[in-house]
Amino acid sequence: MLSAGVIAVDSRPTGWYGVSQAMPRVSEFFGIAIYMYWFDHQRHQAPHFHARVAGEEAVFTLHGSCIDGDLGSRATRLIVEWCQERGAELEEAWAAAAAGKEIPWIAPLR
């Protein structure tokens, strides 16, 4: 697990949607990695993040609604709980990502 303030970057040559860009990891908890793309507001209309667990990927709104993919009920429940705890931080991170600025690390689920 990373310490607060440290951003990990997914080094895959192309993202889940075939976009060739780095996708910073903004949080991680219970084996779930949370990522945000810079300038990703053009691909999905709603503010969102990408989640990965056990080789599966999904896209969630900042309120925890799954809009693409499926991570199963346990991971989805944990993500919804995390969104409720960290709503303001998610909004700040989304604004930074949409503007192409440094995306802050968001504390994991407690």
Where are these regions (language model features)?
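Generic secondary-structure boundary/loop-capping signal
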Residues: M23-V26, E57-V59, G64, D68, ...
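C-terminal structural segments of small proteins and small subunits
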Residues: L78-R110
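A short, structured beta-strand/loop element
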Residues: Y37-A75
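Short, charged/polar N-terminal "headpieces" of proteins
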Residues: G15-Q45
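Intrinsic disorder/low-complexity segments
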Residues: G5-V9, M23, I34, G55, ...
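Intrinsically disordered, low-complexity and often Lys/Arg-enriched segments
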Residues: M1-R25, P108-R110
